[in-house]
Amino acid sequence: MSFTVHLNKILQKYQDLEADLNGGKLDNKELALISKEYSNLKPIIEKLNRYLKAHENIKYLQQVIDTEQDLELKSIAEVELYDTLNYLPKLEEEVKISLLPKESDDHKNAIIEVRAGTGGDEAALFAASLFQMYNRYAERKKWKFELLSISDTEIGGYKEASALISGNGVFANLKFESGVHRVQRIPKTESNGRIHTSAATVVVLPEAEEVDVKIDAKDLKIDTYRASGAGGQHVNTTDSAVRITHIPTGVVVSQQDEKSQHKNKAKAMKILYARLYDLEKQKSQQEQAMSRKVQVGTGDRSERIRTYNYPQGRVTDHRINLTLYKIEEIIQEGKLDEIINNLISENEAKKIADSNIQF
């Protein structure tokens, strides 16, 4: 299908929806459905109209230049034509992006899990820094950051930690954070001043509801036990901690942060739903990847995606070859927008190239 035909179909669809909304013959259910579809199309139509108007303006200005006898008016038209032609590629890009199919999970909240990798205590401290970085980023975006679990160490590091982040566009922004994050710095305990390299793994899962994943109660093994602290000592006298095993997949979720067994089970189930939904999603994506590749990086969670080098004050995202010398702003203040916006733009560019949308 040519772009012109596709464009005309979208415009006609928008006009039909507008006529239906103004017709006054819809029941409440139909009105809600059509209103939603109309709202989804509206920003696309606005971009298309700006693009079409620019083309009309180019034709008009070219005509003025070809026929106008007044040199001053002709000069003004030439300047305006130059500006419009320079702006046209940006309008084209906006239209192409608006026409790309939206990813089904982009509107969802996200569960973020950070785990210390290689590097012992230093890796655990780095994992804690990353987790706190995402907390600050969420604060900047006015998102809700709800702690789900933390397994900490005696020196203040995190073996692993997870949180539910809720708000507008959470998963769309955070989905590219999944992967191995590496840090290069001199540990406080290092007497010889040698730079150590350690790592942490970040996993970002779209929040899943019961409607997204079907779980049979008979497929769950639920164990309860006493919660323990960083040193392994028991911190609760009742069996408030919960371990849930999904037998068919072998996925295990443990939760002990709450004093209430009921609350721990609820949090564990929330994480379990997200992990099972993610398993299904990964399987589907692997099947799609056999025919096409439109994702920034490999999508493999064992892929090293970013390095934080403290001696150089440098943060490098290896998937898009982006280097920023703002390590303190990024980690201490959660200023991730520049990295994330570049990742989103790169992903959109790959999708556009794959979609073969032609003007």
Curated annotation (Swiss-Prot):
Gene3D superfamilies reported for this sequence: 3.30.160.20, 3.30.70.1660, 6.10.140.1950
Residues that bear N5-methylglutamine: Q233
Annotated localization: Cytoplasm
Entry keyword annotation includes Protein biosynthesis: yes
GO molecular function: translation release factor activity, codon specific
Record key words, sorted: Cytoplasm, Methylation, Protein biosynthesis
Record note on modification: Methylated by PrmC. Methylation increases the termination efficiency of RF1.
A cellular component term, taken from the record's GO annotations: cytoplasm
Known function: Peptide chain release factor 1 directs the termination of translation in response to the peptide chain termination codons UAG and UAA.
Family from the record: Belongs to the prokaryotic/mitochondrial release factor family.
PANTHER family in the record: LD18447P (PTHR43804:SF7)
HAMAP family noted in UniProt: Rel_fac_1 (MF_00093)
Name of the protein this chain belongs to: Peptide chain release factor 1
Gene name, Swiss-Prot/TrEMBL: prfA
